[in-house]
Amino acid sequence: MTDQHPHVVVLGGGYAGTMAANRLQQNTNIDITLVNPREEFVHRLRLHQFAAGTGIATAEYAPMLGKRVRLVVDSAVRIDAPARMIRLESGDVLDYDYLIYAIGSTDSTAAGIPGLSEFAYPLSEFESAQRLRVALETSGPDVQITVVGAGLTGIEMASELADLGRNVRLVCGGQLAPTFGAPARRTIAQWFARRRVDVLENTSVTEVRPDSVVLADGTALSSAITVWAGGFGVPALAAHSGLSVDADGRLLTDDTLTSMDDGRIVGAGDAVTTTSLPTRMSCYTANTTGAAAADTVLSHLAGTEPAPFRLAYVGQCLSLGRGNAVLQFTRKDDSPVGAHARGRLTAWFKEFVLTGVPWGLRREGRKPGASVWFKSRPAQAAQHRAEVVQS
């Protein structure tokens, strides 16, 4: 580190990385570099709308990033932590004093499913959503579409298509909307039933073919277009770089989001997990960990002790087409309570949230340090740590 201009590199320009890079500007004496493989910001929460042809999922970085953030369009292929160096796909090398690891998540590998990579359309990245959009636009209006995935991504994709009058089937490996309470799940099921969407719960897809999907019992169902929303995985960059990861490949950090291996590496977003506080892959988690990761780096630079990351969840909201939505209220630990909201007002709230996410990132770029979030009490965080130790 130089005395005048420490260099902080942020890997990944999604919700977490963009938030972190902007927030770092609170220290006016550092150089900030954001590395992202695309020239545009991807609003991932709108990918299902983009794929269906009902929305836009990209935005220019220029108004999104603060003036002191330098964008490098490239991808990291290896982190050399002892040398504090990042090797990029282009062949270039970046030196850093601190690194924020925020590369996000990608499609679930779903190892062992024949035909998945060849014939299915994943819905976790812009490029795959773009291919799906072309397939939908060039297909007949009555072709059979199969969406695989019982979570929010699968439900929102299936409902967006059903709202357009498309012929949709939703295959759920377990129950529909497993993170929601029973009343909210019934609301979602009733919405699909009114639109004649065939929802197959506790049913696994074992093979994807060009014109069908094969279920675990051997049944082959016709499917001209198969959309895969069966979960998310993370890139193997941390593991390949010799850093400690969990069973899913997520970078392991302590409760300040600092890597268990290297105090110069701090994590944020989907590709990271703490040893003390379990978090859900989500935009909300990404934004908050991005802000907290920046705060941790700023504390390190200032020579002060970073504060433990604390987060309280309040709910999960999913859209059902353009005119309806379901908001599942949760406890601070993200477990569902019995209450939920639905209807047009909830749909308006969902759209308000979707619009507010990029607005919040732009605001952080203009006013670094402005973002705040709901936090759990220290006692609750300590309880989470105790539960991890006991397990």
PLM feature spans:
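Beta1-alpha1 glycine-rich phosphate/pyrophosphate-binding loop at the start
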Residues: 2-70, 156-182
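Glycine-rich, N-terminal phosphate-binding loop of Rossmann-like dinucleotide-binding domains
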Residues: 13, 103-104, 110, 217, ...
